[in-house]
UniProtKB/Swiss-Prot annotation:
InterPro entries the record matches: BTB/POZ_dom, SKP1/BTB/POZ_sf
SUPFAM superfamilies assigned: POZ domain
Protein name per UniProt: Putative BTB/POZ domain-containing protein L674
Protein family per UniProt: Belongs to the mimivirus BTB/WD family.
Natural source organism: Acanthamoeba polyphaga mimivirus (APMV)
Organismal lineage: Viruses, Varidnaviria, Bamfordvirae, Nucleocytoviricota, Megaviricetes
Gene3D superfamilies linked: Potassium Channel Kv1.1, Chain A
Highest taxon above the source species: Viruses
């Protein structure tokens, strides 16, 4: 008799379909056992996607924790969870672990304190907000991969999102200009590589391999060679020889190859070689080149990639230093300080850098007039924060047109004595800001890529906003020390 009832088919109708299980599968759950001893089918207020998880749990295919998102419904099935709270947001019931919701959102922490007699089921009080937008908030808080737009930021502020102490740093480099340290030029972000060439052929040439690729570019090429083994830089220069030629030119001979001198080698990491090739010095037109690289066979190559940069907007520059005092929280303590990049671009009327002052410094008259009448020809280089030691900063957010393009921690730095030359070539002239309070000097960590030896720059055209997120609400002041780079 027991075998017969164990094989009984039990049907569960959802709002958009149905499931069938045997009595043997559901009999350990008292709710379903008591029902299916009497009837053969029931209806539940769940859709098929949601009930699929319940069926898998009853079949012992997944753990109970997977059902937490549906805890409010499945508790009617006798599937209980400890430390779970329920909220009604815009007509949809959300289930959370109490520790999660109180540690991530100040709103729910206060909600639970204000209604101690209702817990754990707070659904009798409607939170009159969009449940779709709240779902977006949850998705962001759980993975923090999607960009923060203006609507999402409003929702995060409403619910009092408490960011992780371990901030996930990132930078979207497509928005930034950049400069290679040691060079007198920077690259406009509009002319950064639109493609990466990774496909190449390999020809056996005795004790060397010749790597060949076609590259369509006008000027500068950054070549990244990843090695499987490590080698000292001094030994590397004799093992790699490079040759760039126009398409359809004759096969290069030994005399056409150049050794990898320190001029072309930008950087050598443990297993990575960064090479810069300035094609514009030879040809200066926008065509296809044949790239040939002879590499000794005792160098095991993992991959080679070519980053092609249009040379049309490689710009020379002059540095112009400036500073600004930011006072915040005059009326009440705040935990975010918002600074628009536009406000850092000083005007002639309130700056010592007047037309005559700039001309007296030896700056070209055309450059001075471009500055006075057209300030969008500026990027900001080496933005530094002088912050009193009692103020703790969680992280920095950089926004462009309401989209977060960088999240970064601050890095404490030590100033380098300025070079007695003008314009600067690589090393920047940075003068410490004097203060009668103990302060420390910081820079935005993600704006400096140590591997590629690249500095990312903030430009006027980004419509950038700098958001300083404090660990605790406070009021006071800080100073910004920064330099303009006027390009021409």
């Amino acid at each position: 008799m027991s075998d017969n009832i164990d094989s009984k088919i039990c049907t569960v109708y959802t709002t958009d379909g149905h499931f069938q299980m045997t009595y043997q599968t559901i009999k350990e759950n008292d709710f379903f056992k008591n029902i299916f001893e009497i009837v053969d089918s029931i209806c539940v207020r769940m859709n098929s996607v949601e009930f699929e998880y319940v069926a898998q749990y009853l079949r012992k295919e997944i753990p109970k924790d997977i059902l937490i998102n549906f805890a409010y419904v499945v508790k009617n099935f006798g599937i209980d969870f400890e430390n779970i709270v329920y909220f009604n947001i815009g007509g949809k019931i959300f289930s959370f672990e109490k520790d999660f919701v109180t540690k991530k959102f100040k709103y729910f922490e206060r909600f639970i304190v204000n209604y101690p007699g209702l817990g754990p089921d707070y659904t009798s009080i409607l939170i009159d907000k969009s449940y779709n937008k709240f779902q977006q908030v949850l998705d962001f808080v759980k993975n923090q991969k999607c960009p923060i737009n203006n609507d999402l930021e409003i929702e995060l502020e409403y619910y009092g999102w408490i960011p992780n102490k371990n901030i996930k740093e990132f930078i979207d480099v497509s928005h930034f200009n950049f400069i290679h340290e040691g060079y007198e030029s920077f690259v406009n972000h509009l002319d950064q590589p639109k493609y990466v060439v990774s496909k190449h052929s390999v020809i056996n040439d005795g004790d060397k391999n010749i790597y060949q690729a076609n590259i369509h570019t006008m000027g500068h090429v950054i070549i990244v060679v990843c090695l499987k083994n490590n080698i000292k830089k001094v030994d590397l220069l004799s093992k790699i020889h490079v040759c760039f030629q126009k398409e359809n030119e004759k096969v290069p001979g030994e005399e056409n190859y150049r050794s990898l001198t320190n001029y072309y080698l930008l950087r050598k990491n443990k297993h990575q070689i960064i090479i810069r090739e300035a094609l514009s010095s030879q040809y200066g037109d926008f065509i296809t080149y044949n790239f040939n690289m002879k590499i000794s066979k005792d160098l095991e190559i993992d991959s080679i990639k070519f980053y092609c940069i249009n040379n049309g907007n490689i710009r020379d520059y002059y540095d112009i230093p400036n500073k600004k005092i930011i006072e915040y929280g005059k009326d009440e303590s705040i935990d975010k300080i918002n600074i628009k990049l536009h406000d850092l671009i000083f005007s002639v009327e309130n700056s010592k850098f007047s037309c005559n002052y700039l001309l007296n410094r030896g700056i070209n008259k055309k450059i001075v007039m471009d500055y006075i009448f057209k300030k969008d020809g500026y990027v900001i280089d080496y933005l530094l924060f002088e912050i009193p030691t009692e103020i703790e900063v969680s992280h920095i957010e950089l926004k462009s047109r309401d989209e977060i393009i960088c999240v970064s921690k601050l890095e404490e730095i030590t100033l380098v004595p300025p070079l007695n030359r003008y314009p600067n070539t690589g090393s920047r002239k940075i003068v410490p800001v004097l203060s009668n309070r103990p302060t420390k000097l910081y820079r935005i960590n993600k704006l400096y890529n140590k591997k590629l030896n690249v500095n990312f720059l903030l430009s006027h055209e980004m419509f950038c906003e700098i958001v300083i997120v404090l660990k605790e609400p406070s009021s006071g002041w800080l100073k910004l020390k920064y330099q303009y780079m006027n390009y021409y």
